[in-house]
């Protein structure tokens, strides 16, 4: 299993370095796809470039989904079998990365997803929005197998993820995370869930 860390980035100069360097510290190659961020982000991103950290620049903001699609294609072109998607805002508990990797080693054909465990700092609007999305996911899968469709901390088997992107219409913005997970599920790519805390403070 050859895994690429993919970080879609849009205007997170205060957190992107910590996220990228932490993930590289697990011995993984890291790709940051910058989605048309402000000029102030460029020096931060340029300073991160090394043997194990690459940056691709999208000149115009196209949305999180568009950035992830760009990263998936890069992964294919460079011989990776899996892609570990991580948000750039620093809210994920990155110390759980080995758990996701171990689960993927045991289930290489599954999509391994972070299952957010929220603390008291989670905005109420975010929690209510999650419940609505969870209900929508149940309607589309006729199951409770999609425990959280919005968490951006997940590990895809590359081949089926690219097939979905190329053969179906998947949103280019925040809708991407939920849509690709459901479409993978319809194709028989089942999720494996790893509980992980989410921090907002």
Regions flagged by a language model, labelled:
Residues 2-4, 179:
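Cell-envelope/extracellular polymer assembly enzymes that use nucleotide-activated donors
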Residues 4-7, 31, 57:
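Short hydrophobic beta-strand elements that form part
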Residues 9-25:
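Short, well-formed alpha-helical segments that are part of the catalytic scaffolds
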Residues 14-18, 39-48:
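Acidic helix N-cap motif at the loop->helix transition within catalytic regions
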Residues 34-43, 90:
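A conserved acidic beta->alpha catalytic loop
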Residues 60-62, 66-77, 82, 94-174, ...:
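Acceptor/aglycone-binding surface of glycosyltransferases and processive sugar-polymer synthases
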Residues 169-172, 181-197:
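Catalytic donor-sugar/metal-binding loop of nucleotide-sugar-dependent glycosyltransferases
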């Amino acid at each position: 299993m050859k895994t690429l860390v993919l970080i879609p980035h849009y205007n997170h100069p205060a957190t992107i370095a910590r996220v990228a360097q932490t993930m590289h510290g697990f011995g993984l190659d890291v790709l940051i796809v910058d989605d048309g961020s402000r000029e102030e982000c460029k020096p931060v991103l340029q300073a991160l470039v090394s043997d194990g950290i690459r940056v691709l620049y999208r000149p115009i903001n196209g949305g999180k989904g568009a950035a992830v699609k760009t990263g998936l294609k890069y992964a294919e072109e460079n011989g990776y079998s899996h892609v570990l998607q991580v948000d750039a805002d620093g809210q994920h508990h990155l110390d759980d990365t080995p758990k996701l990797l171990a689960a993927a080693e045991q289930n290489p054909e599954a999509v391994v997803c972070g299952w957010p465990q929220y603390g008291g700092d989670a905005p109420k609007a975010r929690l209510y929005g999650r419940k609505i999305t969870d209900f929508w996911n149940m309607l589309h899968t006729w199951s409770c197998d999609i425990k959280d469709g919005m968490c951006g901390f997940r590990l895809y088997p590359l081949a089926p993820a690219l097939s979905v992107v190329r053969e179906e219409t998947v949103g280019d913005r925040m809708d991407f995370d939920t849509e690709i997970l459901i479409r993978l599920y319809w194709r028989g790519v089942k999720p494996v869930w790893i509980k992980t805390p989410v921090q907002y403070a």
